[in-house]
Design a protein with these regions (language model features):
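Short gly/ser-rich loop at a beta-strand->alpha-helix junction or flexible surface loop bordering the NTP-binding
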Residues: 1-192, 208, 226
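Conserved short-loop catalytic and cofactor-binding motifs
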Residues: 21, 201, 230
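A short, surface-exposed helix-loop junction/capping segment
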Residues: 190-201
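Active-site metal-binding core of divalent-cation-utilizing nuclease and nuclease-like domains
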Residues: 113-117, 130, 222-247
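Acidic-basic catalytic patches of nuclease active cores, encompassing PD-(D/E)XK
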Residues: 200-225
Length: 248
């Protein structure tokens, strides 16, 4: 037996459980518990002693039941099984361009995942590709660009525009990435609305006030300005809200 294997099996099961849970916001799946060396009887004993706390069917909190939002989203993803990812509003919240509002956590799977349950809404998507998946705060999630398409039907055009621009400001999504998602959207109901926003150009705004001024200028026929772009001037660096570079 090689050293790495010997070290793994010499480690007590509870230490292995703690190590796995530490990477998953304190949450762990039953199959992971078994891989750590616990059978069903051992799991039941730890539940009875308060070492494990049921979060969802087949998912446990390790040590204590307290849950941050990240832990709740991680638990929902684990409940979806292998390949499940946070999506829609949950993904947008992880990426930082939408505020969480205590709705059910959206999880997308390619297949399986079971029925939606208390606190979780499962979605199935055959079109979800590897390039649409990332990790945010250690949680498997759809990319920001994909999340924008997913939440678009739930938002007014004004709120969708704000989300797109905020995602750019957070450097979560670039217009090129959003355009790529749109090309592969296969007739998604919100494709046209999202495409109309992306077509106006790069606009990484940080506030609703910046949005308002930018929209007023564009509606008045002004050329699209550079928005919050770096400007080096006289040895200093500035980030003007809106700037029209000199031409000619």
């Amino acid at each position: 037996m090689i050293a790495a294997e010997r070290s793994r099996f010499d480690t007590p099961p509870d230490a292995r459980v703690a190590a796995v849970a530490a990477r998953q916001h304190g949450r762990i799946r039953v199959d992971q518990l078994k891989a750590c060396g616990l059978d069903h009887a051992a799991i039941r004993r730890r539940v009875a002693k308060g070492h494990l706390h049921r979060a969802h069917t087949g998912v446990y909190a390790v040590g204590h039941p307290g849950a941050t939002l990240h832990a709740r989203i991680m638990a929902a993803v684990l409940a979806g099984g292998q390949g499940a990812v946070a999506s829609h509003w949950a993904s947008a919240t992880l990426h930082g361009f939408i505020r969480w509002d205590e709705r059910r956590i959206d999880v997308t799977v390619r297949s399986g995942g079971g029925r939606s349950r208390a606190g979780i809404r499962f979605h199935r998507s055959r079109s979800l590709e590897a390039r649409d998946i990332t990790r945010v705060h250690g949680i498997p999630a759809t990319t920001a660009a994909r999340a924008l398409l997913e939440i678009a039907p739930q938002l007014t055009q004004t709120r969708l525009k704000r989300a797109v621009r905020r995602a750019q400001a957070e450097r979560s999504a670039h217009v090129r990435q959003i355009a790529d998602v749109l090309r592969r959207a296969n007739g998604h109901t919100a494709t046209g609305r999202l495409a109309a926003i992306v077509a106006t150009g790069c606009a990484p705004t940080y506030s609703g006030h910046e949005d308002l001024v930018l929209d007023l200028l564009l509606d008045a026929g002004f050329a699209h300005p550079a928005v919050n772009q770096r400007l080096a001037l006289a040895g200093a660096t500035y980030y003007p809200d809106l700037r029209w570079p000199l031409s000619g």
